[in-house]
């Protein structure tokens, strides 16, 4: 679930604005006040991470919204050249699920889960900035495909001992030439992808660097390969001599348990020089008569071979491991207890290195574990668990198009795929709060398991727009939807062109919400359009039930009936099951040149203590004016009679 969202220098949001978002978040305000601007910033991030071309830092014109070019987005008169967006997410565990959810983007065999288990992610925060680089010769290109400027990503997790650990990574555009980057200037061959990655400077926290140094002792992050604005691979500069010395030391002191992975990461054989052999001879000389042992067992001259023989560390290590068990364990004990073994081997390798040999290399690896988990969660969340339904839904049709192959859970921006999605999943079992649980003032939060079709019919009946709904696959023609309107007309169902527009407006909302997984975020603009005030009122109950099922709903609305229903439910809630923490309401206004967001707090009694001017007060003002006009008319009438 998204818990916080910050926007800066984005259209009418000129100043840095960070809002707390709840399970049900409502935006209300006058037209062109900035409600849609805030939602567009969320859509921008979602359509970017869902985009298949990872080289695009942000996708301005995509599947969810078309925003034009960079200058259309940047606030007029803004003090900064960059647009900044920050999101904070808290993964919600599915308390009803027996098996926690696994990231769909995690590699096969990995164990990255979000749910009730150890090492659970508690919070992820990601801030990204982009610009059009006005000084660049590519400014025209950057207008359509903005340039990545910076990303800051942090992840808070809790282990099985309930100990919290926080990691973070900072990536920003760098103006350094490759020759100025420590560890990269001496590398002879750099391909185009690596060269592009060195345009970004990377900083990792201390815990993450400790994890990196378990594999690469000398690693220094100097670049990054991005997928959009998230890190996919980090480029490290390593000292090859130090890494070879570390590989030898670990293999000797860990009984070879890690040599396979280190050899694979280095990708080459390590040759034992005379200086290294001298160190090993000195360390092991008092342990056992290796020469005699090998003459008896292998008929070889020595453990270290002849002076003319080129000996690789792998071959020598195999000879060492081939000793009889007692002698081998004795030698390994000596090696493990030798405190400065690495320093001596490292010094010997430095001494034996050729004067002009290349001692640095670049390696690329996934980011440290928790940072990788955070990027996978954000990718999975915005690509799969984020859905959007626009304000202008499709008009009623006799037949509806086939479902999109890319996302079989997407009803479409206008709800155009609702019929096919309902037909595809109508027998799927879902968990939801039945409408019967909301027929009393206090909501019963117990969930039931029914098919999607049954759940949709349940809420259609509660809203009073239809008695039943049936979907039918018509082959290449598409899908048909028919509804029954009343019990008296139970023998005949109608297609949506023969019933009120309200059914076609409500169905996409119901299907999209009921089919969504736990820890989804669902965004709606003006869901009340074309709906009777009574239906608008009861729609507040439906969205509240979704929030209680851990499905976050972000709603832009102009409906005072919707707001009043939420106030009633909050006032009616029992003290132990308060609802005001489930709801966040923001009143958006534009006093000067920029949008201003003001939180409207509903207390436990359903009252708004600090009522903003212009916040659904028109009907009350109109009622006062009617009473005032009526009083004046009566007064004038009495005067005329008296005259």
Role assignments for model-derived ranges:
Residues 1-93, 443-639:
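Switch/communication elements of ASCE P-loop NTPase nucleotide-binding domains
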């Amino acid at each position: 679930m998204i818990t916080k969202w910050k926007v800066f220098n984005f259209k009418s949001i000129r100043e840095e604005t960070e809002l707390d978002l709840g399970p049900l978040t409502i935006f209300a305000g006058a037209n062109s006040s900035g409600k849609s601007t805030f939602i567009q910033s969320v859509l921008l991030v979602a359509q970017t991470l869902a985009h298949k071309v990872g080289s695009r830092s942000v996708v301005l014109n995509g599947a969810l919204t078309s925003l034009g070019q960079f200058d259309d987005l940047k606030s007029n008169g803004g003090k900064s050249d960059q647009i900044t967006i920050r999101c904070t997410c808290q993964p919600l565990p599915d308390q009803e699920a027996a098996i926690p959810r696994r990231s769909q983007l995690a590699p096969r065999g990995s164990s990255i889960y979000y749910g009730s288990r150890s090492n659970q992610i508690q919070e992820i925060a990601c801030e990204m900035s982009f610009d059009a680089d006005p000084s660049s010769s590519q400014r025209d290109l950057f207008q359509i495909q903005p340039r990545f400027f910076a990303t800051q990503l942090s992840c808070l997790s809790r282990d099985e001992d309930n100990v919290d650990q926080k990691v973070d990574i900072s990536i920003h555009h760098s103006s350094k030439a490759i020759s100025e980057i420590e560890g990269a200037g001496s590398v002879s061959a750099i391909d185009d992808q690596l060269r592009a990655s060195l345009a970004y400077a990377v900083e990792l926290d201390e815990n993450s660097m400790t994890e990196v140094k378990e594999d690469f002792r000398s690693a220094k992050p100097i670049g990054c390969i991005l997928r959009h604005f998230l890190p996919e691979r980090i480029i490290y500069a390593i000292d090859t001599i130090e890494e070879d010395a570390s590989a030898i030391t670990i293999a000797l002191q860990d009984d070879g348990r890690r040599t396979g992975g280190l050899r694979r990461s280095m990708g080459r054989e390590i040759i034992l020089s005379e200086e290294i052999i001298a160190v090993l001879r000195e360390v092991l000389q008092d342990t056992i008569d290796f020469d005699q042992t090998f003459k008896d067992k292998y008929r070889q001259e020595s453990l270290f071979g002849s002076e003319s023989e080129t000996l690789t560390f792998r071959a020598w290590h195999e000879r060492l491991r081939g000793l009889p068990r007692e002698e081998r364990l004795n030698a390994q004990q000596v090696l493990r207890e030798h405190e400065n073994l690495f320093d001596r081997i490292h010094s010997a390798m430095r001494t034996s290195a050729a004067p002009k040999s290349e001692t640095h290399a670049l390696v690329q690896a996934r980011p440290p574990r928790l940072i990788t988990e955070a990027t996978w969660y954000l990718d999975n969340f915005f690509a799969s668990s984020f859905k959007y339904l626009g304000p202008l839904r499709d008009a009623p049709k006799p037949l509806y198009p086939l479902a999109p192959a890319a996302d079989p859970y997407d009803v479409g921006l206008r709800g155009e795929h609702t019929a096919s999605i309902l037909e595809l999943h109508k027998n799927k079992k879902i968990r939801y709060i039945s409408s019967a649980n909301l027929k009393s003032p206090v909501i019963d939060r117990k969930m039931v398991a029914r098919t999607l079709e049954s759940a949709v019919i349940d809420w259609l009946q509660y809203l009073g727009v239809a008695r039943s709904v049936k979907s039918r696959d018509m082959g290449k023609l598409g899908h048909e939807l028919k509804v029954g309107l009343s019990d008296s007309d139970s023998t005949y169902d109608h297609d949506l062109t023969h019933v009120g527009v309200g059914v076609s407006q409500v169905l996409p909302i119901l299907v999209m919400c009921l089919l969504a997984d736990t820890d989804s975020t669902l965004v709606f603009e003006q869901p009340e359009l074309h709906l009777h005030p009574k239906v608008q009122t009861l729609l507040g109950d439906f969205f509240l039930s979704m929030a209680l099922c851990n499905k976050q709903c972000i709603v832009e609305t102009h409906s005072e009936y919707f707001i009043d229903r939420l106030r009633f439910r909050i006032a009616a809630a029992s003290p132990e099951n308060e609802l005001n923490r489930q709801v966040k309401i923001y009143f958006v206004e534009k006093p000067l040149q920029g949008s201003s967001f003001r939180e409207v707090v509903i207390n436990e009694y359903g009252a708004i203590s600090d009522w903003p001017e212009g916040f659904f007060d028109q009907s009350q003002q109109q009622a006062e004016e009617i009473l005032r006009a009526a009083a004046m008319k009566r007064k004038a009438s009495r005067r005329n009679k008296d005259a």
